[in-house]
Amino acid sequence: MKIYRVAKASEYLVITGILIKDIKLAKKAWILPGQSCSVLDLSPVNYTFEVQAMSAEKLPFVLPAVFTIGPRVDDKESLLKYAKLISPHARHSNHVNELVQGIIEGETRVLAASMTMEEVFRGTKQFKQEVFDKVQLELNQFGLLIYNANVKQLVDVRGHEYFSYLGQKTQMEAKNQARVDVAEAKMKGEIGSKLREGQTLQNAAKIDAETKVIAMQRAGEGEKEGIKVRTEVKVFENQREAEVAQANSELAKKKAAWTKAAQVAEVEAKKAVKLREAELQGEVERMNALTTTEKLKAEFLSKASVQYETKVQEANWELYKKQKEAEAILYEKKAEAEAQKASADATFYASKQAAEAELYAKKKEAEGIVTVGQAQGVYVSKLLNALGNDYTAVRDYLMINGGMFQEIAKINAEAIRGLEPKISIWTNGGEAGGMKEVAGVYKMLPPLFKTVHEQTGMLPPAWMGVLPDKNS
């Protein structure tokens, strides 16, 4: 029948039999008929030995040791080895004890035989570690692990007192060394005492010097702090003065701007009045020009030339208006420049604006001259076409329209004003004598007309006669 077995915390169940190829390790399992189950205790066991060994000088000694040995629980392969090789025997049986003791004694003797007694005695810790490593290497074959190895002090074999003599030697060396150490300590104490006294005096002098230096440093730092504070106060005062000056400057700039705005507004108002007056004056002049044009139309020009004259007059009016606007802009720019001169940092800007305004006025004046020239060219061209390409008639019209004859008459009148000219004719008493002299005056007119024609290019009216022929 089936039996359910459970192992304790430090145990494993070792199961063999049917359905199991080799062995099976488990903490709990059903044990079937035809299967065998044994308990494998994993707790380590202490083994105490006194190993007798011999050094390289053939000196025997005893090595007391206590080894704590048990199965390696962290390796399944080691557990299987232990279950197969060791578990069939009792844990404290002579078989296991002899196995472990034989491994330890064999490795210890081999290692001791390669070392002198002095090396074993002075390198006890290293000797113990090498014994531990070599024994562990052999125990791995059986799945065993050394949990702890406590190798005691080496002991002499009876009849051989090497370690006791070595201990006495060590004691004497230690005693002598102690005496030397006491003498050296006494010497060092006296030297140290004198050294401490000298160092005390040196340190006192050094501290006094450092105290004076620190006091001077503190005084200097205090003076520097005072200077720093005074400097900061002065800097703060300068900053406040600069801010006040800046505020005053800003106020002056604002006042200048306000004054400028007021002056500009006043100038603009005056200029607007002047512009309006100019517009009205222009309108009056335009009406006068239109009236004059109407008169000229009735006397000299055809309907087409009258329309052209009207357009020319309108163009002249537009030109006049633009000139007035240019003058107004120029005046405004000059006013702005004069207002900006109130600010110290605007001199260059005002000069620049005045130059630009003057340039603009010159450009406008040039444009006006060009426009007038173009208009006059168109006017003369139209007038020439209207008069049938008669240059003489055009010239006469322009001279009449330009008032040249009136000006000549005016100049001549001014020249003879107050002379009160009189024509006196003296005759010899003949009846035809007076008329003959009058006829002589009329004979002088053709040469006069010829002179006028040569100077002005104008011909006298037909009713006044014709010019004398050049060949006559």
Swiss-Prot record:
Residues passing through the membrane, by range: none
Residue stretches in coiled coil: 237-327
Membrane topology: Lipid-anchor
Cellular compartments per GO CC: caveola
Tissue specificity note: Very low occasional expression in roots and nodules.
Primary location class: membrane
UniProt keyword RNA-binding, yes or no: no
Cross-referenced Pfam families: Band_7
Post-translational modification summary for this protein: May be palmitoylated.
Biological role stated in the UniProt entry: May act as a scaffolding protein within caveolar membranes, functionally participating in formation of caveolae or caveolae-like vesicles. May be involved in nodule formation.
Official protein name in the record: Flotillin-like protein 6
Species this protein is from: Medicago truncatula (Barrel medic)
